[in-house]
Structure formats: structure tokens, C-alpha cells
């Protein structure tokens, strides 16, 4: 489901990837969280890739619409 949501936000003409941020678990960062703009992400198998960083899907904490503040995904 998460991979499908990200693909939809990246490729569906109704959505603009520049409007979304993905927050993920990153040990050592402030609050162990880091955020990256969706527009910088490439999907490979079970990972998100950006700037040579690989983030497994299970580390994704939240996907937020930056314009509206709507949370599209939040890890339980």
C-alpha cells in the first residue's frame, strides 16, 4: 500500500511531487527523524533512494502534503 501511494504521488497527473515530504526514521538525527521532498525520491524494490541514501519502506514514518498539512500516511 505504501509503495503504491508513493508511486501515485510521483506519477499521477493529479498530484505534484513537489507538494509532499516524506519523514523517515534516521538514527542519530534530531528526534531520530529526517524529512526529504518526495520530488527527490526514486523507488527501487523495497527502498526509497535519494542522494545515494537507501531508506527501506518500513522506516517511513509519515507522508505530508506541504500545502495543506494533510497527513496521507502515518506509521502506526
Curated annotation (Swiss-Prot):
Xref: Pfam families: MJ1316
Protein name, per record: UPF0248 protein MmarC7_1289
NCBIfam families with a match to the protein in the record: PRK04257.1
Annotated family: Belongs to the UPF0248 family.
InterPro entries cross-referenced by the UniProt entry: MJ1316, UPF0248
Amino acid at each position: 500500500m505504501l509503495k503504491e501511494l508513493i508511486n501515485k504521488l510521483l506519477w499521477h497527473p493529479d498530484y505534484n511531487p513537489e507538494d509532499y515530504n516524506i519523514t523517515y526514521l534516521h538514527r542519530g538525527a534530531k528526534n531520530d527523524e529526517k524529512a526529504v521532498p518526495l520530488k527527490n525520491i526514486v523507488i527501487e524494490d523495497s527502498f526509497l533512494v535519494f542522494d545515494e541514501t537507501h531508506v527501506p519502506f518500513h522506516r517511513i514514518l509519515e507522508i505530508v502534503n506541504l500545502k495543506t498539512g494533510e497527513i496521507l500516511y502515518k506509521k502506526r
